[in-house]
UniProtKB/Swiss-Prot annotation:
Statement: the UniProt record of this protein carries the keyword Ribosomal protein: no
Record protein name field: Ribosomal RNA small subunit methyltransferase A
Similarity annotation: Belongs to the class I-like SAM-binding methyltransferase superfamily. rRNA adenine N(6)-methyltransferase family. RsmA subfamily.
Any one Pfam family match given in the protein's UniProt record, by short name: RrnaAD
GO biological process: rRNA methylation
Main location as per UniProt: cytoplasm
GO cellular component: cytosol
Organism per entry: Thermotoga maritima (strain ATCC 43589 / DSM 3109 / JCM 10099 / NBRC 100826 / MSB8)
SUPFAM superfamilies membership: S-adenosyl-L-methionine-dependent methyltransferases
Amino acid sequence: MDGCHLSRDKLQGDGEGCDLKTSDYLKKYGVRLKKHLGQVFLSDDRIAKRIVKAAELTPEDVVVEIGAGAGTLTEELAKTGARVIAYEIDESLAPILQERLSKYPNVELRFEDFLKAKNVPEGAICVSNIPYNITGPLMEKIIEWKFKRAIVMIQKEVGERILAKPGKKTYGYLSVVVQTFYEVKKLFDVSRSCFVPNPEVDSTVVDLKRKPVDLDFEKFKKFVSMIFAKKRKTLKNNLRPFLSIFEGVDLSRRAEQLTVEEIVELYEKWRRALECSRG
């Protein structure tokens, strides 16, 4: 089978025979890709359809897409009848998006930087092909805006970090902050040949479902950053300014050896102690 094709675990291909609409649109409007934006556009409708199917959207849902690009995924989202709010920072893509989406009254295009967005509806569903160059900050924004669910396509390496378990080399800050607030499940891998232009790495689609967790995210990520600041050092080293708070706690282990639950327990102890010290 030519082009991007579906194997058991991975959508892949040789780059020929993929849906060429993305390339055609870019040529039609003379759009030049901007490297500093990490622009990698999905070019296979079948992948978009599979992602949207996994989201199980209804017309009552509000969907946020981060990085609409050339609109391949946006158009499939629009077909569900859900209210779609699509963010795109590159206004040169406006003619493409307007041509592809003008017949869908349920789509709202916002040409702005999602990282600076002020009025994102909380409790919405995020379905996106996340821009590679800002994956970490965008994952934090997904947590901050309390999306009840997120189905996102990200670099395979980042997917491995998000899914990592304690003791694994890839387990770290991103693993902990995402897994604290979301149940995380890998859906499938996507070959680099199914994008325009072809990136240097493959991608992974993950499904995040919000947990009923009530934590101050800003304080929590500060604590997690602190214990992972020097990954090979023990908790005793990384928490040295706060040793009195953790009297009686075994701090001989490294953060990468702790479960998410153990880290949350340490955080709560740290948070309560700081609040008491401030009166």
